[in-house]
Amino acid sequence: MTTNKKIQWRADATHPKIDDHDARLHDERAHFTMLGGRIRYHNSLLSRLRSLSRNRDGGIAIMAAFCLPIVIGFAALAVEYGYGLLVRDENQRVSDLASYAGALAYSTTKSEDKMKVAALAVAKLNGVDGADVKVSLTASPKDARVQAVHVAITTTNTLVLAPVLGVSPKLEIGAQAYSSIGAAENGCIVALDKSASGVTLSGGVQANAGKCYVASNSDIVAPCGTKITAKSATYYEGASEPCQWSSNIVQADGSPAPVTRQYTSDPLAENKGVATLHDRFDIIRKASWPFAVKVGKGPDIEFGDKATPVQTAAAIEAVGCRYDSSNFNQYWMSRWDITCSGSEVNIGSLRVHGDIQVKFNVTGSKNTTYNFSGRIQNAQGTKLEFGDGTFNVAGGIIGADLTFGSGIFHVGQIVPKAEWNESKQALCSGNALYSLCSDGKLTIDGPSTFVLDAGLHTGDGAMMKLGAGTSNSYIIGKSSGDNAIGVGGGSVTALADASSGKGVFRVDGDVDGGGGGSCITFPASAQHDISGNVNLAGGAKLGAGVYAVDGYFSVHTGGANCSDTAAVSGTNVTIAISGTETPSDWECKDKAFCLTGGNAITLTAPSSGDHANLAVIGPQSSKRTAGAEITSGGRGRISGAFYFPNGAIDFGGGGQIGDAATGCLQLIGASISLSGGSQMMSECKLQTGSGKVALVQ
């Protein structure tokens, strides 16, 4: 057991004296004590370092201190650039308004100066300095063929905080807008159907449209030897197939024309006039027609042939009229002057034979009504003249030299008389029975109203003139055949205008102008309703107005007897064709419009109104695909749209079509083909489709 010794220390004392063993033990303990202290010190330091590395106290504050300048900088960017977006939106709004205002001004005045003034005024009104606005007239970004007013606005914002990040203190904010003026300049040659053949040339033909465009929604095929002259050409579904060895789709100066892939909309798809023309056929089909004329039976009056002057005189007195007895001869009379005092005269038939002249109440009242239960007829070599009045003639009128005053004429169908040894073939037309027939010269003054139950016919070499002035009216029914109007070779038929008052022109049947060397003049009328086909082989003058033909329209070989150089001509004329029927001959088979046999047609469309620039309008129903054919030397000069959206337009055999003297030809079809020496020309610049202004970008 070890005895603990108490060692006392004094400040000035030395170590106590101990033996050697104790001294060594004391030294060893002291050594280990010092060593342990060092180890504990090092372990404590490492522990504290580890603790410090794991300690998060105060980290957010430190990181915030480091990141705060960056956060403030980005916040400044967000605020100042966000404000810049607001300014940009405001600039865009102002540029839209200014562009639209400039476009309206230019559309009205065609002045770039006034365009700029209008745009800048709108910008100033909305707080944008004029120095920050640029206004120009340029091409639309949507369609290079359309003009547009371009307005660009560039303003500058000063950045306050963003420069902390080294960003420029100036922020430029831009906006721009385009407002188009009108529609694209329409193409002169347009093929609409994507699945059809497009625009196709062959056989050395040329299509000349140097001042406008050629467009196809399918192919453009122009092999070597053919030529297309245009400002540019476009195709869509198909391809452009020009000559491989030389440029044959060229501009007017001979340089290659731009050819691009672009869809072309139907320029007349929304045309109000086209829609009304299409609807007109429904009106025609639902229209009613007057009842056939019916009158009570009266006594016949016959001059010459088997009737003696005594018998004729008695018949005249029987109807309540008188004759001039001063030159009466019971054996023979070559002249009769008859007067009637009553307001109504009832007669059976009145016929004149031999070398006799008859004047029937030529100075009578216009209010006199003449009722004929039979017919009126004078033979070759005779002359028959009536005054004014109302004429109800149940059995038709046949005139060799027959004249009427003005009035109202309701005439029924000519009927052969067995007792007169008549045959159908002997009655003027030869192949059908009409109401009114001229086999020499038949003239009815005007203005007059005509209701012809069975149509009219002018025989070979004969003349018929109906009406005078502008307030005539025509309702013409169908003969015993298909025709309502028929003309023979070398004949002249003239119908005076029905363009004022209550004048109408309605035809229930075909118009057969098949007599070569003939000329028929149609009246000017707001509307010409023809419930049938128009087939012309001679000449025709088309009075101004709309011709709604519920069938087909064809012009064949024949020559003209009109004063115009063109066989068929018309000014301020629109022809609408339903295509419900088509010709059966091989040249025009299945076509709604056909021009052939070296004949020529010149048409000028109206320049104003609902039907402005509409010349020939084909079937509009997708179920009617009859197109147009110009072939065998047929020649057309047309101003306005020649429009067959659902049918092919084909040229062949030297057929030609081009502009009339005034206006522009616009050829629009499902497809368009030229072959066999044919030619198409449109040598003028078409106007834009409309003056409508639209914001396009």
Residue ranges and their predicted role:
Residues 574-635, 643:
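Extended C-terminal subregions enriched in glycine
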Residues 68-85:
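C-terminal juxtamembrane segment of a hydrophobic transmembrane alpha-helix
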Residues 57-69:
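N-terminal signal-anchor/signal peptide hydrophobic helix marking the start
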Residues 2-44, 82-93, 97-159, 237, ...:
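Short amphipathic secondary-structure patches
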Residues 158-310, 317-318, 322, 326-519, ...:
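Short, ordered "entry" segments at domain starts
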Residues 438, 475, 488, 516, ...:
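Acidic, Ser/Thr/Gly/Pro-rich low-complexity segments that form flexible
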Residues 45-57:
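N-terminal positive-inside, membrane-proximal cytosolic segments immediately preceding the first
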Residues 323, 680-697:
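Short, low-complexity, Pro/Ser/Thr/Gly-rich segments in the mature regions of secreted, periplasmic
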